[in-house]
C-alpha cells in the first residue's frame, strides 16, 4: 500500500509538471495582433514520407521516423536498410495521423544529423525556407502539437491531417531576436521537464526496491527469527549517511 501511494504521488507530480510545461509553452507562443502572421507554406517546405515496411531490419543503418518514434521522443526505434525518404539536419518531422484523442497527432521531432533518418509514410517533413525570417527551432516549438491542427481531432474518428490543413495554419513571426529568446526559454524549460521525466520514474523504481527489501527482511524475520544480511552497497549507503 505504501509503495502504491508513493508511486501514485510521484506519477501525479510528473503529470502536473507536464501540464505546467504545456501551459507555459502555449502562453509564451501566444502573440497579440501586432505580430505579423504568415502561413506555414510561406516559411517552410513540405514533403510526405514513404512506406518502409519491406525494408525494416534490426541492424539497418537508418532510423525510421514514424509515429511511435516521434511520440516517444526517439525512444522506440525501428531501423531500415534503405533511406527511401532522407531527412536532413534541422528538418522537422510531424505525425499526421492518429487515433481519436491520441497524444501523437501533430507531435514533432527535430532532426539532429544528416544520413541517419528516413521519413515514414503519414509523417510530414518540413524545412525552413529562410532562417532570417523564421528560426528552425522556433518553428519546431510552434508546430509541436499546434492547436490549429489538434482541432481536426473530433474524438471519434481516426484523424488524418491533409497537406493543405497543415500548410494553411498561421505562423506568428516576431523579430528574430524574439524568436531566439523564446527558443532559449523553452529549451531550458524543456530540459527541466526532461530531467523530471527521467528522475521521477527512477525515484519510483528506487522506492519500489526499498519497499521490497524491507518487506523481505520482515517476512524472513517473522518466519525464521533471522535478519537478512545487508549487502555491501546497503552498508555503504548507511555509512555514508553517518559520515
Regions found by a protein language model. Name each.
Residues 1-243:
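Charged, alpha-helix-forming regions
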Amino acid at each position: 500500500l505504501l509503495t502504491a501511494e508513493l508511486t501514485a504521488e510521484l506519477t501525479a507530480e510528473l503529470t502536473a509538471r507536464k501540464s505546467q510545461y504545456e501551459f507555459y509553452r502555449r502562453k509564451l507562443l501566444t502573440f497579440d495582433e501586432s505580430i505579423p502572421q504568415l502561413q506555414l507554406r510561406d516559411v517552410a517546405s513540405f514533403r510526405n514520407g514513404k512506406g518502409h515496411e519491406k525494408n525494416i531490419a534490426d541492424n539497418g543503418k537508418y532510423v525510421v521516423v514514424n509515429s511511435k518514434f516521434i511520440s516517444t521522443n526517439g525512444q522506440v526505434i525501428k531501423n531500415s536498410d534503405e533511406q527511401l525518404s532522407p531527412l536532413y539536419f534541422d528538418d522537422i518531422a510531424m505525425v499526421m495521423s492518429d487515433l481519436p484523442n491520441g497524444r501523437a497527432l501533430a507531435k514533432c521531432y527535430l532532426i539532429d544529423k544528416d544520413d541517419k533518418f528516413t521519413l515514414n509514410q503519414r509523417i510530414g517533413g518540413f524545412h525552413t525556407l529562410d532562417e532570417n525570417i523564421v528560426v528552425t527551432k522556433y518553428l519546431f516549438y510552434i508546430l509541436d502539437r499546434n492547436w490549429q491542427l489538434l482541432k481536426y481531432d473530433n474524438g471519434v474518428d481516426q484523424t488524418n491531417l491533409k497537406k493543405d490543413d497543415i500548410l494553411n495554419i498561421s505562423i506568428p513571426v516576431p523579430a528574430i531576436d524574439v524568436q531566439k529568446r523564446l527558443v532559449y526559454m523553452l529549451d531550458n524549460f524543456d530540459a527541466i521537464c526532461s530531467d523530471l521525466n527521467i528522475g521521477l520514474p527512477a525515484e519510483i523504481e528506487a522506492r519500489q526496491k526499498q519497499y521490497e527489501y524491507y518487506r523481505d527482511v520482515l517476512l524472513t524475520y517473522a518466519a525464521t527469527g533471522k535478519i537478512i544480511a545487508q549487502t555491501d552497497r546497503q552498508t555503504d549507503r548507511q555509512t555514508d549517511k553517518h559520515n
